[in-house]
Design a protein with these regions (language model features):
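Catalytic and substrate-binding clefts that recognize carbohydrates or anionic sugar/phosphate headgroups
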Residues: 1-133, 142-143, 148, 155-160
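Aromatic-lined carbohydrate-binding/catalytic grooves of carbohydrate-active enzymes
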Residues: 129-197
């Protein structure tokens, strides 16, 4: 594969001295990912900081912008599990990545400019979901709304104080024993009725 060479259980790319590497979605350490190592593994970390290897979301797309202006390179690893990246951390001139298992699809996109690489990537994965208008509005969110009555009281207080409110975000308290895709019917007997009337 041009640009990439096999390296044990992964691949490597030799970077120029001033190449910039973008991508990986919700990751620490600024826009240029060079000089650190990362994992994309969808972990729910309670403490976010510069030294974390992984955050909540995994976006296995890198965009390399070569310093010499020779054109940009996009690398997309289509894999649902853990991917490890060493982006100039061990060796400043080497980007290396490896998946936890061998069943993945690897895509390499080249174009003269970053915008063209991004366009090709979007064509590959499909258009982004566009949220409803209310999702861009004002939200009240916290952990600890224990019942439907709590939610209704928050909405009533916003209304009584003439404050704008487009949504109330609940954490895991509505779940039955904190199990995904469940609702505790004792505390939230009519969850569907909670949207404002």
């Amino acid at each position: 594969m041009p640009y990439l060479t096999p390296d044990g259980d992964g691949w490597q790319y030799v970077m120029q001295e001033k190449d910039i590497v973008y991508g990986l979605g919700e990751m620490p350490r600024g826009l240029n990912k060079r000089g650190w190592h990362y994992e994309t593994n969808n972990t729910d970390e309670s403490e976010h900081g510069e030294n974390r290897l992984s955050y909540y979301a995994a976006h296995n797309f890198l965009l390399i912008s070569p310093a010499d202006g020779s054109g940009c390179i996009g690398i997309f690893i289509d894999f649902p599990g853990k991917v490890s990246y060493d982006i100039g951390y061990t060796r400043h001139d080497t980007l290396r990545f490896a998946t936890a298992e061998p069943n993945y699809a690897l895509y390499l996109i080249t174009a003269p400019a970053a915008a063209e690489v991004a366009k090709e990537f979007r064509q590959l994965i499909g258009p982004s979901y566009i949220p409803p208008k209310w999702a861009f509005g004002l939200a009240q969110s916290r952990f600890g709304y224990k019942t439907e009555a709590d939610i209704r009281e928050v909405a009533a207080q916003y209304k009584a104080n003439d404050l704008p409110l487009d949504m109330i975000c609940m954490d895991i308290d509505y779940m039955q024993s904190y199990a995904d895709f469940t609702v505790d019917k004792a505390r939230f007997p009519d969850l569907a009725s909670l949207p404002p009337t």
